């Protein structure tokens, strides 16, 4: 009975632990820390509708700008490194907004490991490793792009793993659904930082290998490789 409820109970427990590790005293430091000086400033440009030059794609900074907008921030703070946040900047909410992406990574890691058909002990080990990894927890607690990058990397991997398990139901509605979600996740991760293209490479190499095996199997009917056309 417990095993049947595990896919529901386990992610709830892991998410609760993630909430603690990512949100506990997240607003204690009221100083602009590390790259908050850059990405907070870029978010301010969006809020003030100003053009600026940046080496990264825009989605991450747009989400930072969204967190500022939801926090009631008007974009006037300069985000100078080491400066104290003024009272009218709700930096705690902005950090918590970013932390939400880091929190989601933990249940995603659990479900991904299950989709890859690992043993229960391995699934829990992977989930706890992601939960307790110090660098993952730390970068999720500041106004940075890394938690978003990790989150969309996890969604790409999970959707791809689920898509892979549906090979026997190729061209079904669910198969197409997870294929589209994989593509959407790839688009999101590539729109946060250029290193997200490694996710494209990962799925691309898998696709090449899968097609190579299918085209090389002469016993496989053509309809199993290409969708039927009227």
Model-derived segments and spans:
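Start-transfer (signal-anchor) and selected internal transmembrane alpha helices
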Residues: 1-21, 104, 108-110, 114-115, ...
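Transmembrane signal-anchor helices characteristic of membrane glycosylation enzymes that use polyprenol
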Residues: 3-33, 49, 132, 188-189, ...
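Short helix- or helix-capping micro-motifs
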Residues: 18, 123-131, 138, 158, ...
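Extracytoplasmic catalytic/substrate-binding loops of multi-pass membrane glycan-assembly enzymes
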Residues: 28-41, 51-66, 74-76, 89-92
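Short acidic/glycine- and proline-prone juxtamembrane loop motifs at membrane-interface regions
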Residues: 33-34, 135-149
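Transmembrane-helix motifs of polytopic, lipid-linked glycan transferases
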Residues: 92, 96-117, 155, 159
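Membrane-interface transmembrane helices that cradle and orient dolichyl/undecaprenyl
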Residues: 114-117, 156-177, 213
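Perimembrane helix-loop-helix junctions
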Residues: 159-168, 186, 199-230
């Amino acid at each position: 009975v417990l095993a049947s409820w595990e896919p529901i109970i386990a992610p709830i427990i892991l998410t609760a632990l993630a909430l603690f590790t990512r949100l506990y005293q997240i607003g204690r430091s009221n100083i602009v820390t590390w790259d908050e000086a850059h990405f907070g400033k870029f978010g301010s440009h969006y809020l003030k509708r100003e053009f600026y030059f940046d080496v990264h794609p825009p989605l991450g900074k747009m989400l930072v700008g969204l967190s500022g907008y939801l926090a009631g921030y008007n974009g006037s703070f300069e985000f100078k490194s080491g400066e104290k946040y003024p009272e009218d900047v709700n930096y705690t909410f902005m950090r918590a907004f970013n932390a939400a992406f880091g929190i989601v990574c933990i249940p995603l890691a659990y479900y991904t490991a299950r989709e890859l058909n690992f043993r229960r002990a391995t699934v829990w080990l992977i989930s706890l490793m992601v939960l307790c990894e110090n660098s993952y927890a730390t970068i999720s607690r500041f106004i940075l792009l890394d938690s978003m990058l990790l989150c969309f990397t996890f969604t790409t991997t999970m959707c791809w793993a689920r898509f892979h398990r549906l090979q026997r139901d190729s061209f079904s509605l669910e198969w197409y659904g997870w294929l589209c979600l994989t593509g959407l996740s790839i688009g999101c991760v590539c729109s946060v930082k250029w290193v997200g293209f490694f996710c494209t490479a990962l799925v691309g190499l898998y696709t090449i290998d899968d097609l190579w095996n299918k085209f090389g199997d002469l016993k496989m009917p053509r309809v199993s490789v290409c969708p039927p056309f009227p």
